[in-house]
Amino acid sequence: MSVQQYDEIGEAFEGFKSLPLVRYGEVPSFLGMVGDVRGKSVLDLACGTGFYSREFKRRGATDVLGVDISVEMIAVAREIEQREPLDVRYEIGDVSELRPLGRRYDIGVAVQCLNYAESAAALERMCRNIHRSLVPGGEFFVFCQKPDYRFDCASLDKYGFLCEPTGEESETGPRARVTALLDPKPISIVSTVPRREVYEECLRASGFSEVRWVPLQVSEAGIREFGEDFWTDLLAHPPLEMLRCRA
């Protein structure tokens, strides 16, 4: 189902990065966690239209490969690469069936990727494929919906999103509908919110160590733009969280 959802979104996915939660929360938090990529190779899993792939290349990564299951997303990423060449490579691929890549990468990143696994076994399979694609000691960074997010807290609409439970429960956790309030047409995506222990157990079983959760933050630019009070509800109940570990 996730393939169809993202194929239908296509280039509109780029608009997500302009919404306050993403622009001033997700992007600076995630890039800050990953840190210095100069001279390193990066594997971007569920790369979408290539936003982070391009950003890592601009920041000095030597080799960046973006992989996504959506044909349409990869088509858009390649189109952008043609218009603004950065020497980023993209390929269509399912992380749960990731092919041997012919080399190992220094850094792996997965933004809203592992939460599309339909079961704990599928999530562990994703993690094993990622682990074998990284150099020993390589770092893996995850950005995902917060496992224990309270859906009954203040609305996220002023930050550009709605996050609602669908009422369904999967093997790994509740299912949720996230709506990006884009103009002129909002876009909704349904995925699972795996429990914290599911992530941790699957990563460790796949050979990862030093598993650590990292909280979402708001950038100084976001505070200057909107003021501290604007972000109070978001920081009291952040809908997103990050995770880092080592291969």
Region spans (language model):
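Mobile, glycine- and charge-enriched loop segments
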Residues: L31-L43, F140-V142
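Class I SAM-dependent methyltransferase SAM/SAH-binding core
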Residues: L43-L45, T49-E97
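A short glycine-rich, Lys/Arg-flanked "PGG" loop and its adjoining helix->strand segment in the class I
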Residues: E124-P136
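Conserved class I S-adenosyl-L-methionine
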Residues: M1-V37, F51, E55
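C-terminal lobe and adjacent flexible extensions of AdoMet/dcAdoMet transferase-like proteins
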Residues: C202-A247
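SAM-dependent methyltransferase
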Residues: F141-C202
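A short acidic, Gly/Pro-enriched loop at the edge of an enzyme's catalytic core
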Residues: R99-G108
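A short SAM/SAH-binding and catalytic strip from SAM-dependent methyltransferases
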Residues: I107-A121
